[in-house]
Amino acid sequence: MTSVCFTGHRKIDSPDMYALKSLLDSTICGLVKRGVTDFYCGGALGFDTMCAHMVLYLRKRKALDIKLHLVLPCSNEEQTKNWSYNDKQEFYAIMMAADSIEYIGSEYTKDCMKQRNARLIELADCCVAYYDQSNSRSGTGPVSYTHLRAHETSQ
């Protein structure tokens, strides 16, 4: 196993933030010890952003030989069209630090997020997911879809 993707909710409650970051740190470090070198993020707000930051942080602070790859659903302008100024700046900083960027398409379509998720699963040997049972749907459909695709791919 050498590659992992991330998926999860866009909204993370503040009380969960510290514990989630700590768990993410130990999860990524554990995966690196098992041979994972490539981490794939979908570039969405919330968990994707947190994961991208953590990969970059661990690469720099702990001198880990790991790579961050972004798989984006559409062009930067389309994806960030309704984002706040601060969210856009954070996104562009992550893009500048990423090792590679792949675009599913140039324009936003009704299926581009699902196509992005399918591509993430296709590229990864394993998927790390953040699931909040009080929020069982995401902007891209049922969370179970990505879980199901990951399970099917692993068999």
Question: What do these predicted ranges mean?
Answer:
Residues 124:
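An anion/phosphate-binding loop that grips the pyrophosphate of nucleotide cofactors and donors
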Residues 132-139:
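Glycine-rich, Arg-bearing micro-motifs that act as flexible, cationic patches
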Residues 115, 142:
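C-terminal binding/interaction regions
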Residues 146-153:
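Conserved small/polar residues in nucleotide/adenosyl-binding loops
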